[in-house]
Amino acid sequence: VRSRGLGDVYKRQGKTWAYSDFYQAKPGITDYTKLKPNGHHPANTAHVKEYIDFASAHGIDGILVEGWNEGWEDWASYRKDRQFLFNKAYPDFDVKELQRYAKEKGVQMVMHHETAANAADYERQLDEAFQFMVDNGYHAVKTGYVGYIIPRNEYHSSQWMNNHYIHVARRAADYKVMVNSHEAVRPTGLCRTYPNWLAQESARGGEFETMGGNDPDHTCILPFTRLKGGPMDYTPGIFETRLSYYNGEKPNERVHTTLVKQMALYMTMPSPIQMVADLPSNYARFPDAFRFIEDVAVDWDNSWYLEAEPGDYITVARKAKGEDEWFVGGITDENSRTATIPFSWLPEGKQYIATIYEDGKDADWDTNPQSYRIRKVVVTPKSVLKQKLAASGGVAISIKEADKAEMKGLKTIR
């Protein structure tokens, strides 16, 4: 499958990049500092340095920090004419020191601009905000529009807001800044015109698991609907799925997937910017599973959709861009099933080792989501794998070429 949906349609209509001399945007994976214990200001210099260390140690390209700038004390009122300042950090967030430290560790800092739905005020501050980013070494921003749009209670999908999103993308391009927009309108292929508009949320992403939850079939629908318009920042990678772990007031609420399904989402929900959305301490509890997130690519040379039924299941294989590495991700809805995974898309004449991350025999998204198993097998282009998926479960596979010594003692899938 080579189509990028509406992006290709838009291109065929004669539209081209609005910024043909735009810099090379590099895809990457980013740690996400939102799921944190509350009661204090976690977006402080010392704490963020811990995340930079974590990112550096695990090959994560960047760190996205929410809550760095002044205005968060009562931001959910959604009614102030000016809620946030986008060029003024809290006193305990040292912008220049963190940039120095991150650069030393080989990690990019990603800016966050939550507008609390005050899009008009954001436009007034836009040039100052982007200049602040440039002056301090930020090259990417996540924007947010939570609430009722100020000043006129516009819908997020209104013409006024559509014009706003495009205006932000254009001005960001002028400053050579990449944009990942949340609470935005569904995409229509404009990421081809503005290549710095790297991704959007524009559907119920992973954070909605804390607000009533996403049904198990939700991520089996999005690849056939939302994803046709362009990349989605879904924020996968949640290993601790019990919300009671974070909030004792929600003892019976949980993320509606198994741990392995969270890993598979990195393939079924493609985006050139992917989040590593859980706490580092949770990943430390499952280091063998986290290895897959360390290894998985975010940019692809080719993709093969192996089986799919909208709302029920989807299995996709992808080749990492410029590398002889392949990855497979398969997910299912609330029903357990057996996926049929052929490997005929692999180059002929070679043998490969497939590392399979699979749901455990007793895995279930509701009762036992963290049950998983990892095994290695040999595959060839003639192999066909019959793989069991738990209820709202998945499978994630990484594949590399192998020599005879590496294959010794491993089972070959026929």
Feature map (PLM): residue ranges:
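Carbohydrate-binding surface patches
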Residues: E309-I353, V395-S398
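Catalytic domains of carbohydrate-active enzymes, especially glycoside hydrolases
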Residues: H47-W68, D135-H139
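Active-site mouth loops of central-metabolism enzymes
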Residues: Y19-H47, H112-Q125
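Solvent-exposed beta-strand/loop surfaces of large extracellular or lumenal domains
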Residues: I356-K382
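Single conserved hydrophobic/aromatic residue that forms the stacking wall/gate
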Residues: V1-Y10
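C-terminal beta-strand-rich structural cap/linker in extracellular carbohydrate-active enzymes
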Residues: K376-R414
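Glycan-recognition and catalytic regions of carbohydrate-active enzymes
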Residues: D278-F327, D362-N368
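Aromatic- and carboxylate-enriched substrate-binding clefts and catalytic-loop regions
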Residues: E66-R254
